[in-house]
């Protein structure tokens, strides 16, 4: 029987599954709809990021399963659970990049909370996985902010 702290780990991981599903679609939206002088750079970057998002979805969902949970697996459930919001459409290239930066910063904060809960549950594998995702996001934030300067 799982303790309440172990159940909370699964809930927090599922939030991240949902966030990455929404972000995956958002990044595709930006990839398809970016325009302007930075088209080639951003078109490629958004593809890199949605490919990475796909890997995070799978890794997070499989971790939920491995700790006895059930991963969110529908778009409707993802939209309901996610803290990340869909793109509204019509964003400029700079607004797209700013939106991704803001989403990544928010995710870093949520990942830190989830990692602390995983640490409390003595779930080192989950904590390590979350640390790795966080480190990647922090690097992306740095690079994308440099692009916006």
Swiss-Prot record:
Query: Which UniProt keywords are present, listed alphabetically?
Result: Cytoplasm, DNA condensation, DNA-binding, Iron, Iron storage, Metal-binding, Oxidoreductase
Q: Which residues form the signal peptide?
A: none
Catalysed reaction, written as an equation: 2 Fe(2+) + H2O2 + 2 H(+) = 2 Fe(3+) + 2 H2O
Q: Name one GO molecular function term.
A: oxidoreductase activity, acting on metal ions
> InterPro entries under this entry?
DPS_DNA-bd, DPS_DNA-bd_CS, Ferritin-like, Ferritin-like_SF, Ferritin_DPS_dom
- UniProt-annotated binding residues for Fe cation 1: 31, 58, 62
Q: Which CDD domains match?
A: DPS
Q: Which GO terms describe its biological process?
A: chromosome condensation; intracellular iron ion homeostasis
Q: What is its EC number?
A: 1.16.-.-
Superkingdom as given in the UniProt entry: Bacteria
Binding site residues for Fe cation 2: 62
Location(s), subcellular: Cytoplasm, Nucleoid
GO terms under cellular component:
cytoplasm; nucleoid
**Looking at the keywords, is Iron present?**
yes
Q: Which Pfam families match?
A: Ferritin (PF00210)
On assembly, the entry states: The 12 subunits form a hollow sphere into which the mineral iron core of up to 500 Fe(3+) can be deposited. Homododecamer.
Explain the purpose of this protein.
During stationary phase, binds the chromosome non-specifically, forming a highly ordered and stable dps-DNA co-crystal within which chromosomal DNA is condensed and protected from diverse damages. It protects DNA from oxidative damage by sequestering intracellular Fe(2+) ion and storing it in the form of Fe(3+) oxyhydroxide mineral. One hydrogen peroxide oxidizes two Fe(2+) ions, which prevents hydroxyl radical production by the Fenton reaction.
**Domain-level remarks:** 12 di-nuclear ferroxidase centers are located at the interfaces between subunits related by 2-fold symmetry axes.
The record's comment on protein family reads: Belongs to the Dps family.
Listed name of the protein: DNA protection during starvation protein
* Lineage of the species this protein comes from: Bacteria, Bacillati, Bacillota, Bacilli, Bacillales
Task: Quote the gene name from the UniProt entry.
Answer: dps
């Amino acid at each position: 029987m799982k303790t309440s702290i172990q159940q909370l780990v699964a809930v927090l991981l599922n939030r991240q599954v949902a966030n990455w599903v929404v972000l995956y679609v958002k990044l595709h939206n930006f990839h398809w709809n970016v325009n302007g002088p930075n088209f080639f750079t951003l078109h490629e970057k958004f593809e890199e990021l949605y490919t990475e998002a796909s890997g995070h979805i799978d890794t997070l969902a499989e971790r939920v399963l491995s700790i006895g949970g059930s991963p969110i697996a529908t778009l409707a459930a993802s939209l309901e659970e996610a803290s990340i919001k869909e793109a509204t459409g019509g964003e400029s290239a700079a607004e797209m990049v700013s939106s991704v930066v803001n989403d990544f910063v928010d995710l870093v904060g949520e990942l830190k909370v989830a990692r602390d809960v995983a640490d409390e549950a003595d779930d080192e594998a989950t904590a390590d996985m979350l640390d790795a995702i966080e480190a990647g996001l922090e690097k992306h934030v740095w690079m994308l902010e440099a692009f916006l300067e």
